[in-house]
Amino acid sequence: MCCSILHHRNPRREHEFPAVVTSPVTENHIFLGGAGERGLTINGTFIKFTCIGVYLEDKADKSLATKWEGKLEELLETLDFYRDIISGPFEKLIRRSKIKELSGPEYSRKVMENCVAHLKSVGTYGDAEVEAIQNLQKLSRMLIFHLVLLKKNRQSPDGILGLSSSKDISIPEKEDAIIENKAASSAVLETMIGEHAVSPDLKRCLAARLPALLNEGTFKIGN
């Protein structure tokens, strides 16, 4: 595997990412596009807190394959490649498992700061986005992170962000809450793999895996 998180020296089950899963909400087949570690800079020190796996609906191959056939080095430096993943008309699922304890309020504050910074930079931080980010922050605080082993965000093509959590490694069947704002939903994934990504490892893995997975005949659901 290309991602360091997929061949950790002391692997744990919660840090493993299946190649293909079924969305418990839509029942769509979704495949693992890439996985990596995410951290935050706190008081000048970068600390790893979570493992992230990004899953894409199987129809992503038609949306991405014909346009992105470049080499790893080219894709790594091409922001439009990641933006096409973020804005693509297909379901996305972000699965996160913890490496290090981090309180719900501290985690949500850092994530929201990154989301707001992106929304302001692209000029989409209006009243609706302010409300959506505030709601997202409140919901994140409710899901106190040190009590949760796995968290999941589901992003639908029409802009719905579904939030759920689990105390074991299973993917939750029901969502705890939803945020209906496309800009805010996209901003969550943007902070992970966009221009100022908090998970360079995840970006590298996406650039390495997706071209091979999306080549005609290479990726088939059920294989």
Swiss-Prot record:
EC number: 5.5.1.6
Superkingdom of this protein's organism: Eukaryota
Summary of the function given for this chain in its UniProt record: Catalyzes the intramolecular cyclization of bicyclic chalcones into tricyclic (S)-flavanones. Responsible for the isomerization of 4,2',4',6'-tetrahydroxychalcone (also termed chalcone) into naringenin.
Keyword Zinc annotated: no
Misc remark: Part of the biosynthetic pathway for all classes of flavonoids, a large class of secondary plant metabolites, many of which are brightly colored.
PANTHER family: CHALCONE--FLAVANONE ISOMERASE 1A (PTHR28039:SF10), CHALCONE--FLAVONONE ISOMERASE 1-RELATED (PTHR28039)
Alphabetical list of Pfam families matching this protein: Chalcone
Residues where substrate binds: 50, 114, 191
GN (gene name): CHI
Entry protein name: Chalcone--flavanone isomerase
Organism: Pisum sativum
Keywords: Flavonoid biosynthesis, Isomerase
InterPro entries recorded: CFI, Chalcone_isomerase, Chalcone_isomerase_3-sand, Chalcone_isomerase_bundle_sf, Chalcone_isomerase_sf
Catalysed reactions, as listed in the record: a chalcone = a flavanone
Pathway of action: Secondary metabolite biosynthesis; flavonoid biosynthesis
GO molecular function: chalcone isomerase activity
